[in-house]
A protein has these predicted regions:
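Non-catalytic, alpha-helical, charged scaffold/linker segments
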Residues: 1-47
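A conserved, positively charged/aromatic
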Residues: 108-119, 155-162
């Protein structure tokens, strides 16, 4: 279990919280810890404070109230939808189904950076150092970098909580592995939990039921 879930349990979940995570983001200790992480050390303090506060405020707004009960929580994207699904399943000990109709992290980051939508996004963040496709854009800005890292890491955080994840085609599953989906761990048991589920259906598989209805 990702240790970051303890922040949710202790600082956000209304059923278990003992402090406000949102309030914590304004403390000196929190900002010092965040400011020493990777490229964030290069971000001016004022910009970093508001960047972090914007991200955390969305998470807090989504999760600080008690989530409704469901036997299965379903999201068809990673990002905030998966965060809600994973949190709900954690709260009630139920299931979380992720059906990735497309790779939301890849598409969202590529849209933000104005890259070709088919280009892969990976957890080594090499894509942030690539030459921009449109010369007028210049280097990736600190805001774009922070935004991209936030969405990639949010996906990596949510993926392991899925009881099952589906993909439309094999390449999508492999790209999900590159973004941080634990495909090998999900498929190491007796039954695969990360599977290919293409669009459409085989008519013969439902023919019997169809003809029974016509009778």
């Amino acid at each position: 279990v990702n240790p970051l879930w303890s922040f949710y349990d202790e600082g956000i979940n209304p059923r278990t919280r003992t402090y406000s995570l949102f309030a914590l983001t304004g403390t000196r200790e929190f900002m010092e810890a965040v400011g020493n992480w990777g490229f964030l050390a290069q971000v001016p303090f004022g910009e970093l404070f508001w960047e972090i506060r914007n991200f955390v405020s969305i998470v807090y707004a989504l999760l600080h109230e008690r989530l409704p009960y469901a036997r299965v929580y379903h999201a068809h994207t990673t990002g905030y939808a998966s965060l809600l699904g994973a949190a709900g399943a954690r709260d009630y000990g139920t299931s979380f189904l992720l059906t990735e109709h497309n790779l939301y992290i890849r598409d969202t980051v590529n849209t933000k950076l104005e890259r070709n939508m088919a280009k892969p996004v990976t957890t080594d963040y090499a894509f942030l150092n690539e030459e921009r496709e449109h010369p007028g854009l210049g280097p990736v800005t600190l805001d774009e970098r922070a935004w991209s890292v936030w969405f990639v890491e949010m996906g990596r955080f949510c993926y392991p909580s899925a009881d099952m994840a589906t993909y439309l085609y094999p390449k999508a599953l492999e790209e999900a592995r590159g973004i941080g989906a634990p495909i090998d761990q999900m498929n190491e048991g007796e039954k695969d939990r990360a599977i290919i589920l293409p669009n459409g259906m085989l008519i013969e598989s439902v023919a019997e039921a169809y003809y029974a209805r016509q009778a």
